[in-house]
């Protein structure tokens, strides 16, 4: 992929000079990669879309191509820092993966963005090996959640094996030849016994999940976010995310839930009115409290924030200055 020109100036978020972020409107952000060639075809973009996410060539070119270029610059800068540090210490430089965290609410589109970044970053000559792991694989098995009385808290921080996730990212970041992670099935809504995802020394590792930016729970413990070289938070208004969640639920109810093996097969026979009511209840009881209490408070910890409008398009980008 070709390089683009230098970045143009932005404004402090909200016009507040005390904010750690600089905010760029969509048009200004899009100019930052105007000379870069979009390496994906329309058919590839369609394959990357999530349910209800109208991702298209224009959105990729104006929003995510500049982001991939910025990440490419960060990768190069981080590698250079590792080299000079190794020289200073008189040690042999060891290649370590660049780790990116992608966070945001359920239904906000973070999975689509993570998949898209994987494809875009793998097209840069210096980062051909890009791996994507979601934190779903580090959820406690349903049987354990039931034992602890946490099934209705699935997706909340306490429902994850955070130590296992931290060990996994630490091993990858340390350059381990092969690291394994549990596999999660959205059909069975559970960890699949014996199934694994294998990560083998990638150039870039993307970790996507609801609460990946959460700090450690007090004391001096290490959090997985401490291992990120870059982090992205996908932001939108609560009412828009609630609407996207409901529409996604209806799409699944008419499709995937019809599979008798689906954990949610019991919802397949609901009328549209009943399905909407059920989706609204799940949102109000589980997803919105998790967003309010655990997910959105981590937004300020991100290196970059993507702000979405009601149609899923990104309207502005906030980049941390310090």
Swiss-Prot record:
EC number: 2.7.1.33
Catalysed reactions, semicolon-separated: (R)-pantothenate + ATP = (R)-4'-phosphopantothenate + ADP + H(+)
Cited InterPro entries: P-loop_NTPase, PanK, PRK/URK
Keywords of the record: ATP-binding, Coenzyme A biosynthesis, Cytoplasm, Kinase, Nucleotide-binding, Transferase
Organism expressing this protein natively: Leifsonia xyli subsp. xyli (strain CTCB07)
Keyword Aminoacyl-tRNA synthetase: no
GO BP, sorted A to Z: coenzyme A biosynthetic process
Keyword NAD: no
Gene name tied to this protein: coaA
Compartments reported by the entry: Cytoplasm
Molecular function via GO: ATP binding; pantothenate kinase activity
Binding site for ATP: 104-111
SUPFAM superfamilies per the UniProt record, alphabetical: P-loop containing nucleoside triphosphate hydrolases
Pfam families on file: PRK (PF00485)
Signal peptide start-end: none
Biological or metabolic pathway of the protein: Cofactor biosynthesis; coenzyme A biosynthesis; CoA from (R)-pantothenate: step 1/5
Family according to the record: Belongs to the prokaryotic pantothenate kinase family.
Name of the protein: Pantothenate kinase
GO cellular component, as recorded: cytoplasm
